[in-house]
Amino acid sequence: MEHSGPSEVTGADTAGPDPQLAVTMGFTGFGKKARTFDLEAMFEQTRRTAVERSRKTLEAREKEEEMNREKELRKQLEDIEPTPSSSSAVRERSKSSSRDTSSSDSDHSSGSSDDELIGPPLPPEMVGGPVNTVDEDILGPLPPPLCEEGEDDDDDDLEDEGEEDNPIHRIPDSHEITLKHGTKTVSALGLDPSGARLVTGGYDYDVKFWDFAGMDASFKAFRSLQPCECHQIKSLQYSNTGDMILVVSGSSQAKVIDRDGFEVMECIKGDQYIVDMANTKGHTAMLHTGSWHPKIKGEFMTCSNDATVRLWEVENPKKQKSVFKPRTMQGKKVIPTTCTYSRDGNLVAAACQNGSIQIWDRNLTVHPKFHYKQAHAPGTDTSCVAFSYDGNVLASRGGDDTLKLWDVRQFNKPLFSASDLPTLFPMTDCCFSPDDKLIVTGTSVQRGCGSGKLVFFERRTFQRVYEIHITDASVVRCLWHPKLNQIMVGTGNGLAKVYYDPNKSQRGAKLCVVKTQRKAKQAETLTQDYIITPHALPMFREPRQRSTRKQLEKDRLDPLKSHKPEPPVAGPGRGGRVGTHGGTLSSYIVKNIALDKTDDSNPREAILRHAKAAEDNPYWVSPAYSKTQPKTMFAQVESDDEESKNEPEWKKRKI
């Protein structure tokens, strides 16, 4: 048997693993062969790619410079009136340029040398030839008119892009619809996440449901109820899933109802005689507002006049989940007027009556994470705090007629502040636009002193960029839905307005404005047909129609038509009616039962009337005493003193 030397490599060794070794180790192979790389080829490919990229960049830059030079030349030609000499000069210059270019390309040189000016000169806009791309540094002839039209299109595109970048053009205010809630202030607005239903609440205790898909042009609510009886509605908000609505009223107990208005749960009322509000199971004073958690289903928050902010769960209405107690810098109680969650739900923000804004971590209820004590004027009700969609900025609407913007990451001073925004209601709203570039709030006015406005501020510069005059009443609530791109406004005269743009908005009010109002069915009535016969006899002639007033006076005299009640019966009753003893049967019976049957006659005189007849004709008593006692004897009258003397000792009164 021959064995190969150590320097020899067999084909089996190079092709794959040893079969005997594979059988011994229990596997079929050693995997894929290691990949080899040719570094020189890779380096050459990288170099070529870099050169090609640099060449393209240089060509694009040179082409842009050439276009700029052509534009300048075209402007100069437009300013100067064309003459034959000038046209010839331009033509000669273009021809000389073509000759210079022909050094690199013979075809172009032959074509340009044959091109000569024959006849009158052409207009400046038609003078030109193909752009020479061989040498970018040489100024070529004028471009054709099609290039100018393309440049105009580019300018229009740039203008359209500028309009899209301007946030004012995104405000949907071209059209509006008005929903009649009532006659009193609309103090609460809520829109579900899908934008299908709107719910409104007001000072008239009513909560009304509006379905955009089910409404027609009459704009009528499909349901109205009073969930909190005689308490004003202060806040309405749909949950993040849209199946429940949080109702906050002037009472101390918040309620949760479903989409159809049926009650799901009611928070318990706390013990108002306990000093520490953390030991009570619920609020003990009037509520201000409430808010759903943006991430956790079934969790919501309320704030009250008992100086607490409480977190609740729908599954446990008998006790709150946690309690936040706002405090002043001196540790005293302070009433929160509004509260909200951050966009991620990790922070809880509340504004208080002393002008401070306090922000807690949701899991740490003792000390606030951020506390700014002079955010607004002390003693005023801050009506709203709202987080931006990115979660970094907080907007606050103060009762001191200001709107301020805060950075949560540096909560030591306001970023911007806007004044001269009057407010008269403790629930005036402020909100961010869906693209986070605008901030919206409403203004209040006295009755008959102007119109309420919806004011838009740019977030980056905080300049007042736009205003919408709503109505001759205060603007209380405002809501900008991100999916519908529609703005809902609640006013002080009982109206809820919806602003939209057919090109920028989706669904919502667009679904109901296209539906025609249903016509009411007229009841069919049969009227008497009058036949006018002027030559008929008077006995068959029908009486003329009198005026309504005269007909009513005539009907009044008729006891049957006027339903005149029967007069009372004088004297004894007749026809089944009781007479003078009363108008009803019960009074007659009472009078007969309570009759006074006392006899006022003297009994002695009544007996003495028969004394002479008894003496002349004795029958009963006198014959019995005629023999034994013929002479009548009467008892002697004794005084009271003698009677008392004859009494025994044990009966005498002791003095």
From Swiss-Prot:
Ranges annotated as biased composition (Basic and acidic residues): 45-78, 541-566, 645-655
Record bears the keyword Acetylation: yes
Ranges of biased composition (kind: Low complexity): 99-112
InterPro entries linked to this entry: G-protein_beta_WD-40_rep, WD40/YVTN_repeat-like_dom_sf, WD40_repeat_dom_sf, WD40_rpt, WD_repeat_GAD-1
WD repeats: 181-220, 228-269, 282-322, 331-370, 377-416, 422-467, 470-509
Modified residues (Phosphothreonine): T580
Record keyword Oxidoreductase present: no
Annotated stretches, region: Disordered: 1-24, 43-170, 541-582, 632-655
GO CC term, one of those recorded: site of double-strand break
GO molecular function, one term: enzyme binding
SUPFAM superfamilies: WD40 repeat-like
Modified residues (Phosphoserine): S622, S639
Cross-link (Glycyl lysine isopeptide (Lys-Gly) (interchain with G-Cter in SUMO2)): K297, K591, K597
Record-listed N6-acetyllysine modification sites: K453
Similarity section: Belongs to the WD repeat GAD-1 family.
Protein name: WD repeat-containing protein 70
Lineage: Eukaryota, Metazoa, Chordata, Craniata, Vertebrata
